[in-house]
Amino acid sequence: NKENIRKIVSLRLEKANLLGFDCYANFVLDETMAKNANNVMSLLNNLWSYALPKAKAEATELQKLMDKEGKGEKLEAWDWWYYTEKLRKEKYNLSEEDTKPYFKLENVRDGAFAVANKLYGITLSKLEGIPTYHPDVEVFEVKDADGSQLGIFYVDYFPRPGKSGGAWMSNYREQHGTTRPLVCNVCSFTKPVGDTPSLLTMDEVETLFHEFGHALHGLLTKCEYKGTSGTNVVRDFVELPSQINEHWATEPEVLKMYAKHYQTGEVIPDEIIEKILQQKTFNQGFMTTELLAAAILDMNLHTMTDVKNLDMLAFEKEAVSYTHLRAH
């Protein structure tokens, strides 16, 4: 694939040059909030300076765990996830089986709705008898604080044959002028089985809040033209509303609103909340450096102004060396 990559990069550079840009990165970034490659690299390098020491400290902690085993082995890239999971269990002793009973799907969904009500004054009420494309789909009417309709929200939470996996937000009709939006969240949560309801993992809880953040972006928009409404925004802004909404999921005050044991109704204990919060920052130095290393490599590749003699192996080796990381 080395030659294919070189051709792709070459064609991208040629396209950028034809449109008056010195490199492909500046062409792509021209209509974003970042504006240009210099701003992006400044941000990435600044984040790197904070993330790398944290990742190194995490590596030291993992090495100590390996040393306890007495094998005399040095931590390698392929060891990271195995020993990270061992360390997680040792430090926090919190599993999905401890948290899932508190995360009944309907309670989590209603918790997300309650947060939206507190933040924006909106209400979501379930509608019955509305035609949908599948019996699993539920429909909610979204109203503003004054009772006026903002839009219709569909939820399609469960997997089925022929349905794609993953999670996303879609528009069936975008808001424009006085036309109200029809917005959908699609997910792949486990369906109820017998007397056991759909119980979510912590990751799935954050996914629900995240996708609902996208939905709110589409529902609360007020634009004259649908081409600028909702999620029709610059690429480096589109994830902001969803990321912000996702963070509400693990706020202690919010957790106590919706995280209740599906059998007893017990509110999630403070001890579990504390462990959830501690785990959110666990291994984040490594996770952040991995993301940054990939972004820096991509930026280095697409800020090149001459790729005629591009040697991908040499380029990648230099890029990895620059970030002081092993190739994971």
State each model region's role:
Residues 35-36, 191-192, 233-239, 246-249:
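Short, conserved secondary-structure transition motifs
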